Design a protein with these regions (language model features):
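Short proline/glycine-enriched turn/loop motifs at strand-loop junctions of beta-rich domains
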Residues: 31-34, 102, 113-117
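Predominantly extracellular/luminal regions of secreted and cell-surface proteins
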Residues: 2, 30-31, 125
Length: 206
């Protein structure tokens, strides 16, 4: 049994401005998002009614410039009842990937469009998927994890993360931890560009 999952796609913008209509349709030109991408929203003033801060939403009904969101994967579209005020921004978040039963987890990290950002990698051992975008707690257990570059064996500290600064690259890493049940990644700062993160393993515990 093999594991191969995508945490981020380089096609998806990591953040961008959007508007929302009472038809529940969110518009953001050439957003690049895909169905089931995970988002959170911020605003300079007030979000459209029906959308909340610090809340995870799943993308659905994608077109080139529009999409809707739901509170659960494949769920009912959120009912947007006004357009809000100010400038609104979506932020792409990493999905929780179930890695239980696999060892020697490997990462492919590919940056595009002169990426200037910081990305950190997260793991959890709890039974149910944690909310990697919420504060750590006894009921939401996760931590940042160290990764090792397979080219030169250099280590990237989990609390520091990986910070490409305008020079795109394709890099491979090993996750420096076994017995991981859940894995994800989070963008902690962003100026430009996109990133694709794939996790894989072809070795499972017997």
């Amino acid at each position: 049994m093999n594991l191969q999952q995508k945490v981020f796609s380089y096609l998806s913008k990591l953040q961008a401005a959007f508007t929302a209509a009472v038809t529940d349709i969110i518009t953001s030109t050439a957003h690049g998002l895909q169905d089931e991408d995970l988002l959170q929203f911020t605003t300079t003033t007030t979000l459209p009614a029906g959308l909340s801060l610090a809340t995870n939403y799943y993308v659905r009904d994608v077109t080139a410039n529009t999409f809707k969101v739901s509170l659960t994967k494949g769920g009912v579209a959120v009912d947007v009842t006004d357009t809000g005020t100010g400038t609104h921004t979506f932020h792409l978040k990493g999905k929780a990937i179930l890695t239980d039963g696999f060892e020697h987890l490997e990462l492919g990290v590919n940056t595009e469009n002169d990426a200037n950002l910081t990305i950190k990698f997260q793991v959890s051992y709890q039974d149910d998927a944690p909310d990697f975008n919420a504060v750590q707690s006894p009921t939401n257990q996760w931590d940042y994890v160290d990764i090792v570059d397979t080219e030169d064996k250099s280590s990237v500290d989990g609390d520091t993360g990986l910070s490409p600064a305008g020079s795109d690259d394709n890099r491979h890493f090993a996750v420096n931890k076994d017995n991981v049940r859940w894995f994800s990644a989070i963008i902690t700062s962003w100026t430009a560009g996109t990133v694709e993160v794939n996790i894989k393993s072809n070795k499972s515990y017997s």
